[in-house]
Amino acid sequence: MDTSYPREDPRAPSSRKADAAAHTALSMGTPGPTPRDHMLWSVFSTMYLNLCCLGFLALVHSVKARDQKMAGNLEAARQYGSKAKCYNILAAMWTLVPPLLLLGLVVTGALHLSKLAKDSAAFFSTKFDEEDYN
């Protein structure tokens, strides 16, 4: 009893031309880079507690992007990752721009007040004679 594999007669003529015509290989090209989920950036944006909870929205979309990437749906993962990136950028802008504007207002206000104080000091240092009161 012969149980060896393959169970073909090695002396039989092979039809390589028929096999080559029956099988076709399709090359789709190299897959693109894996989508980014921006998870770490979203976690830090969430921890900073910025305006309108944009960091939390970024974290939600980052988790969805990671889930879709693990499921193999790369296009949905790219879309969720892109939304997470946009929310992170908005959160960073809402976090950085108002304090910078406030700092600019304080500096310009201080400069303006120092100029007013300088002008008013000259006014109060004026000495009047007794003849001026008559």
From Swiss-Prot:
Q: Which residues lie on this side of the membrane: Cytoplasmic?
A: 61-88
Q: How does it sit in the membrane?
A: Multi-pass membrane protein
Q: Report the outcome of residue 52 to A.
A: Strongly reduces expression at the cell membrane. Reduces palmitoylation. Abolishes palmitoylation
Q: A Pfam family in this protein? A: CD225
**What is the protein name stated in its UniProt record?**
Interferon-induced transmembrane protein 5
Quaternary structure, per UniProt, is: Interacts with FKBP11.
- Asked if the record carries the keyword Secreted, the reply is no
Q: Which residues cross the membrane?
A: 40-60, 89-109
Briefly, what is this protein's role?
Required for normal bone mineralization.
Lipid anchor (S-palmitoyl cysteine) at which residues?
52-53, 86
UniProt note: phenotype after gene disruption: Embryonic lethality, leading to the birth of only 7% homozygous mutant pups, instead of the expected 25%. Only two out of eight pups were female. Crossing homozygous mice gave rise to about one sixth of the normal litter size, and many newborns died within 48 hours after birth. Homozygous newborns display no striking phenotype other than smaller bones and especially shorter long bones, and this phenotype persists into adulthood. The radius, ulna and tibia are frequently bent in newborns, but this is no longer the case in young adults.
Q: Which InterPro entries match?
A: CD225/Dispanin_fam, IFITM_antiviral_protein
Subcellular location(s) per record: Cell membrane
> GO annotations under biological process?
bone mineralization; bone morphogenesis; in utero embryonic development; regulation of bone mineralization; response to rapamycin; response to tacrolimus; skeletal system development
Q: Where is the composition biased (Basic and acidic residues)?
A: 1-20
Q: Where does the record place the region Disordered?
A: 1-31
Q: Which UniProt keywords apply?
A: Cell membrane, Developmental protein, Lipoprotein, Membrane, Mineral balance, Palmitate, Transmembrane, Transmembrane helix
* Gene coding for it: Ifitm5
Tissue specificity note: Detected in embryonic bone (at protein level). Highly expressed in osteoblasts of adults and embryos. Expressed in primitive hemopoietic cells.
Induction or repression? By interferons.
Q: How is it modified after translation?
A: Palmitoylated.
Highest taxon of the lineage: Eukaryota
